């Protein structure tokens, strides 16, 4: 599974989605199977067997990836990041688990790929949104393992959709004006205009 999939892509809206991959589901099934096996072969009471199954199930959910969405809306000038955690929802009895963050699209200045350590599994990659306010915000809460190319491809898609390269060029032109303008501001014009006629003083004496 790639980093994120494109759910919808128009000239004004880009909708990205991500769901738990095969690794997450494999971990869930594997840890839950350990709990079931412990309960099946154990001679303990029914309460202990339920504890084995429930404990392993929650450990598996804790290590499971989340469902995530990102919506870039040009017409509303906003970025909407949504996260759904099954573990948090069950732990809080459905009171929490859905999180939403709204960012101002006009403050977005750059999109980059960042490397991050993934617990027990090595290094992964994720996209980071860099804002004009100086803050950076990850596009997803967890990094993806494997090839960096999928994450870089998504970052390139975001840059094209939002026109960030053109924006960065305009900002650079505003910060560093043409050299000719700087010379004029210092009062350095044509050197021939500032030189006096060497024979001018002699003519006035005569």
Curated annotation (Swiss-Prot):
Stated name of the protein: Cytochrome b-245 chaperone 1 homolog
Alphabetically ordered keywords of this record: Chaperone, Endoplasmic reticulum, Immunity, Innate immunity, Membrane, Transmembrane, Transmembrane helix
Function according to Swiss-Prot or TrEMBL: Functions as a chaperone necessary for a stable expression of the CYBA and CYBB subunits of the cytochrome b-245 heterodimer.
Cystine pairings recorded for this chain: none
GO cellular component: endoplasmic reticulum; endoplasmic reticulum membrane
Family of the protein in this entry: Belongs to the CYBC1 family.
Sequence intervals crossing the membrane: 21-43
Pfam family, one: Cybc1_Eros
Annotated organism of origin: Danio rerio (Zebrafish)
Subcellular location(s) of the protein: Endoplasmic reticulum membrane
Region (Disordered) residue spans: 172-206
Keyword Ligase: no
GO biological process terms, semicolon-separated: innate immune response; respiratory burst after phagocytosis
Residue ranges with Acidic residues bias: 174-184, 193-206
Encoding gene, per UniProt annotation: cybc1
Topology versus the membrane: Single-pass membrane protein
């Amino acid at each position: 599974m790639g980093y994120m999939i494109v759910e919808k892509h128009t000239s004004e809206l880009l909708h990205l989605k991500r769901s738990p991959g095969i690794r997450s589901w494999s971990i869930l099934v594997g840890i839950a199977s350990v709990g079931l096996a412990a309960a099946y072969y154990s001679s303990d009471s029914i309460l202990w067997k339920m504890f084995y199954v429930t404990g392993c199930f929650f450990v598996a959910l804790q290590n499971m990836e989340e469902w995530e969405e990102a919506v870039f809306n040009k017409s509303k000038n906003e970025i909407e990041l949504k996260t759904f955690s099954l573990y948090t929802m069950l732990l809080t009895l459905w009171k929490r688990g859905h999180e939403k963050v709204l960012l101002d699209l006009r403050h977005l200045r750059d999109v980059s790929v960042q490397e991050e350590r993934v617990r027990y599994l090595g290094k992964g990659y994720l996209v980071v949104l860099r804002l004009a306010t100086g803050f950076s915000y990850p596009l997803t809460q967890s990094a993806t393992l494997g090839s960096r190319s999928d994450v870089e491809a998504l970052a390139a898609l975001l840059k094209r959709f939002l026109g960030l390269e053109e924006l960065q060029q305009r900002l650079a032109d505003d910060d560093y004006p043409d050299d000719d303008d700087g010379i004029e501001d210092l009062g350095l014009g044509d050197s021939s205009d500032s030189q006096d006629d060497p024979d001018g003083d002699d003519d006035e004496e005569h």
